[in-house]
Swiss-Prot record:
It comes from Streptococcus agalactiae serotype V (strain ATCC BAA-611 / 2603 V/R). Pfam families: PGM_PMM_I, PGM_PMM_II, PGM_PMM_III, PGM_PMM_IV. One of its GO terms (cellular component) is cytosol. It catalyses: alpha-D-glucosamine 1-phosphate = D-glucosamine 6-phosphate. This is Phosphoglucosamine mutase. Catalyzes the conversion of glucosamine-6-phosphate to glucosamine-1-phosphate. Its EC number is 5.4.2.10.
Amino acid sequence: MGKYFGTDGVRGEANVELTPELAFKLGRFGGYVLSQHETDRPRVFVARDTRISGEMLESALIAGLLSVGIEVYKLGVLATPGVSYLVRTEKASAGVMISASHNPALDNGIKFFGSDGFKLDDDRELEIEALLDAKEDTLPRPSAQGLGTLVDYPEGLRKYEKFMESTGIDLEGMKVALDTANGAATASARNIFLDLNADISVIGDQPDGLNINDGVGSTHPEQLQSLVRENGSDIGLAFDGDSDRLIAVDENGEIVDGDKIMFIIGKYLSDKGQLAQNTIVTTVMSNLGFHKALDREGIHKAITAVGDRYVVEEMRKSGYNLGGEQSGHVIIMDYNTTGDGQLTAIQLTKVMKETGKKLSELASEVTIYPQKLVNIRVENNMKDKAMEVPAIAEIIAKMEEEMDGNGRILVRPSGTEPLLRVMAEAPTNEAVDYYVDTIADVVRTEIGLD
């Protein structure tokens, strides 16, 4: 991570940390860096989610892009993976998404995609950061015909929807409950599943700029669980604010997380001989029960650091086609280059339809170990140094010794927020509470803000 870029772009409280001034500079400097090798006029696609700050930051970002001669295609409200898809298939120079994903409405973020549809690598981000930190802006300032132009491109949304539909099958007879988080999926998920002939019900589809992720979506699936039970739905599908992740709910109203979703899709692909190298890429946060289920099926796993960008890096490097995170980021590289909640939802319903199995039956093949995650608010400059605090390092070592290999502990900084995350897995809820609470108490005493 750099000074400005975290694991998922630049994020902060809108108009306080992520200001219009910074958005303008990101547009100007980011656009310049990403268009250096273009022979024709560069084209950049820009989209946003439904946050009230989105239009403010969009306007500033676009102004910065136009100031270095870039032709900007304004997509409006669109899922993050929609930007990735359109950049790649329409041969644009780059794409930019304005969103803070699952964060609350007061936050926002800006992330860039290269011409290949992948998120920027560290080197490109450092180039942009160097320009941000320069004492003087020495970039060219074209005038008249050298300035960029702005093109409204609402048809991009429908192109993404049609692509999504092309990856699925007819869902006639399937009752699907959708929670679009009052976010970007509001613009597309309903249309996609209607076109696939599903019998749908929808919540979280009334965005007002302030209610994105507020009690709805993949981080708050309780309303969706109730809806599934009340309506007798076959499946519930909860997206986050920018629709790059999915959490599912089975017909009994039980949560099916990213680990179980990856297992279901991975086993389906493996059985068909379509899982590249018979391997799923996952992170250190994946559940031990997921690992055991993969071992039982003879499916290999590759483990990365937390963050979908690291999953994607490993997939690209080694030629894998399925990977993701417990949080619901699932990357299906046969179709798209980034986590895509709606694509994942379509593939999950396809497995149900083709196998004739209920989601609960498919998910029951993974027995999840009790896991507890506690977020502790700390100073941003301390979250990466926590393990250097002797008392914290000592208590973690003590708890790991007590586990004696029957469980695990993971303490790591958030890539996007001023938080230290303490996670443990163990055979019982009582044990996992003990391990996490003991460590968390020491962290709070030593460096916590609350």
